[in-house]
């Protein structure tokens, strides 16, 4: 049984918060997800770069879709922890978010993500998720 997140994509529907971010899903299969993202003007902070919260939300979205593609019984899940490391500022340019499931246990999962632009690492994230 496919996870509801992925079933909705088959009909062209994306979770509203991801739609608001402007994410374009490239793939979500076998524990891996990839998005393209062009940050909106509204995501730019007072320093002229993308606010870190938008970067975190984008990484979290990739993490969620990667895990959804790995779960076999359409279980729900929620983030327990999300740790971000910012490697360089992101201007308003297209970036690719990718996530890969590292481990799935009976009740928890561990997923890693990166955000890159033109091959350069912008941010990396690690997340622990509770399987409901």
What residues fall within each predicted segment?
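Terminal targeting signals and extreme-terminal segments of soluble enzymes
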Residues: 1-132
């Amino acid at each position: 049984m496919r996870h509801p997140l992925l079933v909705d994509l088959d009909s062209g529907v994306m979770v509203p918060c991801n739609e608001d971010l402007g994410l374009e899903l490239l793939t979500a299969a076998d524990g891996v997800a990839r998005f393209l993202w062009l940050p909106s003007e509204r995501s730019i902070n007072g320093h002229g770069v993308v606010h870190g919260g938008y970067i975190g939300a984008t990484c979290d979205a990739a993490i969620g879709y990667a895990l959804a593609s790995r779960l076999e019984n359409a279980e729900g899940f929620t983030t327990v922890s999300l740790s971000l490391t910012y490697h360089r500022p992101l201007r308003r340019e297209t970036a690719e978010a990718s996530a890969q499931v590292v481990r799935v246990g009976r009740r928890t999962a561990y997923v890693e993500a990166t955000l890159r632009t033109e091959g350069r690492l912008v941010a990396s994230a690690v997340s622990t998720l509770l399987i409901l």
